[in-house]
Amino acid sequence: MRNQEVINKAEMTLSTLESGGIMNPTQASTFIRMVQDTPTILRDARVIQMDHDTQKIEKIGFGQRILRAAQEGVALTKDQKSVPSTSTVNLSTKEVIAEVNITYDTLENNIEKDGLQNTIMQMIAERAAVDIEELLVNGDTSSSDSYLAQLDGIRKQATSHIVDAAGEELTRQTFKRGYKAVPPKYLRIPQEFRFYTSPGIEVEWKDRVADRQTNLGDAAVQGGLSSAFGVPIKGIANLQPYTIGEGDTAADVSDIILTHPKNIILGFSRNIRIEVDKDIRRRMFIIVLTAKLDSVFEEEDAVAKIVKVKE
């Protein structure tokens, strides 16, 4: 297909996709799934597609033992009857905007791989997912960055169980202290939890494990998923390091977040707006995406954060 034909087809496809500015429900659901399928923390998280800008999610749990010794012919007393504790998690979306530039050459190189509309939506989703992950992880309403200041991300929300590594080197004790900080009632199946780290800390831990003359060490060298105390360790690109101290005492450190992946909720409104323009001088389409989202922990008490771990 000639370049001009690709451009003409892209214009027609984008005008259909734009659909008056708002994606139709099918397009929106497809796009959200594409965002979730990208290799970011979004793939692990629990993504909720919202019909409105705000939504309450009911959560239910038993904080104590509910089974009792059975006695034939004797009913449970009022004190022995378990009442589920109920509460809600509130999602209140914030509007985010992204500009995605797709060159004519990029379209031409991808035109034969799949339907053009699917190809374009995939390109937008892949580029938007990284920015969404950054907001989900590093959002801070006190930030000077207007994008990050829209909401508090999981790094800021984790406050109940903090372990301060004080700039010390990464060791098994670092993970052990974080593990023990989470109330045992949540860690019934440790392998379902994750230690989310910076890529640098993940590599440091794999390097330490690789020194062991075991199958685990061999797997770490070959890029397998490493673990600590039965909990897999996963590096997240946007869990970036920061500097503490000054002068000779300055050091690059980062945080580690321990939680169940599905404890991280990303609310994504289906009201997704897309607007398109064409820059003939730079030979590209300019696609502006506007979406609304929010992120919370379903159970913040089931989270531990290890801070100031040396990179």
Swiss-Prot record:
It comes from the Bacteria. Possibly a prophage capsid protein. Belongs to the encapsulin family. Family 3 subfamily. This is Putative prophage capsid protein YqbE. It comes from Bacillus subtilis (strain 168). The gene is yqbE.
